[in-house]
Curated annotation (Swiss-Prot):
It comes from the Archaea. Keywords: Chemotaxis, Hydrolase. It comes from Thermococcus kodakarensis (strain ATCC BAA-918 / JCM 12380 / KOD1) (Pyrococcus kodakaraensis (strain KOD1)). It catalyses: L-glutaminyl-[protein] + H2O = L-glutamyl-[protein] + NH4(+). GO terms for biological process: chemotaxis. Probably deamidates glutamine residues to glutamate on methyl-accepting chemotaxis receptors (MCPs), playing an important role in chemotaxis. This is Probable chemoreceptor glutamine deamidase CheD. The keyword Hydrolase applies. One of its GO terms (molecular function) is protein-glutamine glutaminase activity. Belongs to the CheD family. It holds the Pfam family CheD.
Length: 161
């Protein structure tokens, strides 16, 4: 069974299934996995920090508050925060004519994701971020492996992390 995660959303599962998200541009997709209990989760965050944007609306649309929700729901399925491993995708620079640091949302999303993972003691074990193209990712909850598909310079690139 495949669960599709939209922008500003997340999903968790235990032992089986695929959790996917499509069209990661400047957004980031963060997968977390507890190998021992085979609990996985995926967050598709739109913006870096809730406080910076007034904290309005859905907390899952922000990296910092969305990650917190994801971890809490994974713990309900038996995951241990000490055993979580993270993989990070997305954070592309989608607008080539933008050079203002404040408008480089993709770069900021990646920076905040790394900071928040480190703050929580979660090891980042794989990453495919930046660039100019969108990505689609599929987390296999039975193994923790993430299949990524992206288009770069007109070529489709697939990789497993």
């Amino acid at each position: 069974m495949e669960v599709k995660v939209g922008i500003g959303d997340y999903a968790v599962a235990k032992k089986t299934g695929i959790i996917s998200t499509y069209g990661l541009g400047s957004c980031v997709g963060i997968t977390l996995y507890d190998r021992l209990n085979r609990v996985g989760g995926l967050l598709h965050a739109l913006l870096p920090e809730s406080a910076r944007y007034g904290g309005r609306g859905n907390p899952a649309k922000y990296v910092d508050t969305g990650l917190e929700l994801l971890i809490k729901d994974m713990m309900k399925l038996g995951a241990s925060p000490r055993r979580l491993e993270a993989k990070l995708f997305g954070g592309a620079h989608m607008f080539t004519n933008v050079s203002n640091e404040n408008l480089m949302v993709g770069k900021k999303n990646v920076e905040v994701a790394k900071r928040e993972l480190k703050k929580r003691g979660i090891r980042l074990v794989a990453e495919d971020t930046g660039g100019k193209g969108g990505r689609t990712i599929y987390l296999d909850v039975s193994t923790g492996k993430v299949r990524m598909r992206k288009v770069s310079n007109g070529k489709v690139i697939e990789a497993v992390f």
